[in-house]
Every structure is written in C-alpha cells, then in structure tokens.
Amino acid sequence: MNGIPMEHGLILASILFALGLVGLMMRRNMLFVLMSLEIMMNSAGLAFIVAGTRWGQPDGQVMFLLVITLAAAEASVGLALLLQLYRRFKTLDIDAASRLRG
C-alpha cells in the first residue's frame, strides 16, 4: 500500500500558497495578513515534507522545523506590531501602520 502521491501533496501545497498570497494581497486588516503569511509558510513547509518523503531523506523534516521556527518568530513580532497598532490607532488597518513611524 503506497501513500499519497507526490504530485497531490505538491498540488495541495501550491493551492495553499496561492490562497495565502491572495489573502495577503486582498486584505487590509493586519490580522488577516498575518494569517495569510502563516498559511504561505505552512504550505512551503508541506512542500519540503512531501519532497523529503519522496526521496526518503530527512532533510524535508529538518527544513520544516526551520520553517516552523521562522513562522513562530514572525507571528510573535507581527502580533506585537498588531497590538501596538491597535493601542495607538484603535484600528487594524494596514494603512494606519504607515503613520506608526512618527
């Protein structure tokens, strides 16, 4: 009994990446932008896992651990910015972030 074919895993990863990219470009709310970035990072991690499984190498799993670490750091910095944006301007709109510099 074989597992899921590599093509199906890569198609799923590319669909998730495309959905994250669309969410990143279409939304103005910073919370949804952060969620879209997380979806994109997880889809890249899924592609690493699928490729590593296909060739029987543990490199995909190691790269996935690095992707998860990067995603956690990105989420913590992004949520800190989100909190400051909401405290100062009472909005989560991305355009208000450009006024945060002053």
Swiss-Prot record:
One GO cellular component term: NADH dehydrogenase complex
Chief localization: membrane
Location(s), subcellular: Cell inner membrane
GO molecular function: NADH:ubiquinone reductase (non-electrogenic) activity; quinone binding
Cross-referenced InterPro entries: NADH_UbQ_OxRdtase_chain4L/K, NUOK/Mnh_C1-like
Catalytic activity: a quinone + NADH + 5 H(+)(in) = a quinol + NAD(+) + 4 H(+)(out)
Sorted UniProt keywords: Cell inner membrane, Cell membrane, Membrane, NAD, Quinone, Translocase, Transmembrane, Transmembrane helix, Transport, Ubiquinone
TM regions (residue ranges): 4-24, 30-50, 62-82
Keyword Transmembrane helix found: yes
EC number from the UniProt entry: 7.1.1.-
Topology of the protein relative to the lipid bilayer: Multi-pass membrane protein
Enzyme class: translocase
UniProt-listed GO biological process terms: ATP synthesis coupled electron transport
Keyword Magnesium: no
Described function: NDH-1 shuttles electrons from NADH, via FMN and iron-sulfur (Fe-S) centers, to quinones in the respiratory chain. The immediate electron acceptor for the enzyme in this species is believed to be ubiquinone. Couples the redox reaction to proton translocation (for every two electrons transferred, four hydrogen ions are translocated across the cytoplasmic membrane), and thus conserves the redox energy in a proton gradient.
Similarity remark: Belongs to the complex I subunit 4L family.
Oligomer and partners: NDH-1 is composed of 14 different subunits. Subunits NuoA, H, J, K, L, M, N constitute the membrane sector of the complex.
Protein name, as recorded: NADH-quinone oxidoreductase subunit K
Species for this entry: Chromohalobacter salexigens (strain ATCC BAA-138 / DSM 3043 / CIP 106854 / NCIMB 13768 / 1H11)
